[in-house]
């Protein structure tokens, strides 16, 4: 089973002040405040003025995609640019990580200290090696939204945060180590339910207009819809690993 974390899952608990809160002293249930291991990107609080940080050395295709992400013609690109690419006090690092199994990406570090927000996204090295460019792109955008939500919960009063973002239902899964992780699914009748999928779908089409709307939607739904159809699951499986030669997107050179 492919696991791209539901993007509204910020790692915060249900009580005020969790997940790198403005007070800077608490961690969410994902232990987001753990020691920063970004390597060449520097330690926590040392990445000021770097904004969107490329720590993907050895994965040129992913590096090229990351360069394009803030400049594509879609809503998420504009949000990424406005949040991280124009503010030297809000920084995001993308880095590759081995041994992530079925997890495509995860927000592994978050810190809000002295008015500076730093966050790190770990991306599955196997996905960066074998997935189509479209799959890598939507995974990066998906995880960016996790980071964006963490930024919002770090800087907004909790009641404003909960009013701004959709209500969700909670469920539990086990990670590759057998640890219980809480995740969240959108309430189906929520009026904004479709807009999140639409934004991710449009980001794929803006990157590759040849991809059909229904195909892009299948990629966008992965990790947003708790249970997707068998056909959509197969599409994601094929795009995640080009070695099966059943993909429709662009293979990395």
Model-derived regions: residue spans:
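Low-complexity, glycine/serine/proline-rich disordered segments
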Residues: 1-116, 228-253
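Active-site or metal-binding loop neighborhoods of secreted/extracellular toxin and effector enzymes
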Residues: 2-27, 161-253
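Soluble non-cytosolic domains of exported or imported proteins
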Residues: 71, 130-135, 139
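Active-site scaffold of zinc-dependent metalloenzymes
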Residues: 103-134, 150
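Active-site recognition of the HExxH zinc-binding catalytic motif
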Residues: 138-151
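Extracellular C-terminal loop/segment signatures of secreted glycoproteins
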Residues: 156-159
């Amino acid at each position: 089973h492919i696991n791209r974390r539901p993007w509204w899952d910020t790692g915060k608990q249900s009580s005020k002040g969790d997940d790198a809160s403005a007070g800077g002293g608490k961690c969410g249930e994902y232990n987001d405040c753990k020691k920063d291991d970004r390597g060449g990107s520097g330690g926590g609080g040392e990445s000021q003025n770097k904004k969107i940080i490329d720590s993907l050395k050895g994965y040129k295709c992913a590096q090229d995609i990351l360069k394009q992400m803030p400049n594509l013609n879609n809503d998420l690109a504009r949000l990424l640019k406005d949040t991280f690419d124009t503010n030297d006090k809000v920084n995001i690092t993308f880095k590759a990580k081995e041994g992530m199994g079925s997890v495509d990406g995860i927000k592994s570090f978050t810190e809000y200290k002295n008015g500076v927000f730093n966050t790190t996204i770990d991306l599955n090295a196997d996905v960066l090696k074998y997935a189509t460019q479209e799959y890598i792109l939507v995974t990066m955008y998906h995880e960016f939204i996790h980071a964006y939500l963490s930024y919002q919960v770090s800087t907004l009063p909790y009641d404003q945060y909960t009013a701004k973002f959709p209500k969700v239902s909670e469920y539990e899964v086990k990670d590759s180590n057998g640890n219980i992780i809480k995740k969240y699914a959108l309430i189906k009748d929520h009026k904004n339910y479709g807009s999140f999928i639409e934004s991710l779908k449009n980001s794929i089409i803006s990157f590759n207009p040849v991809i059909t709307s229904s195909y892009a939607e299948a990629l966008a739904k992965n990790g947003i819809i708790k249970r997707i159809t068998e056909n959509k699951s197969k599409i994601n499986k094929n795009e995640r690993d080009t070695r099966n030669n059943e993909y429709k997107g662009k293979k990395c050179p």
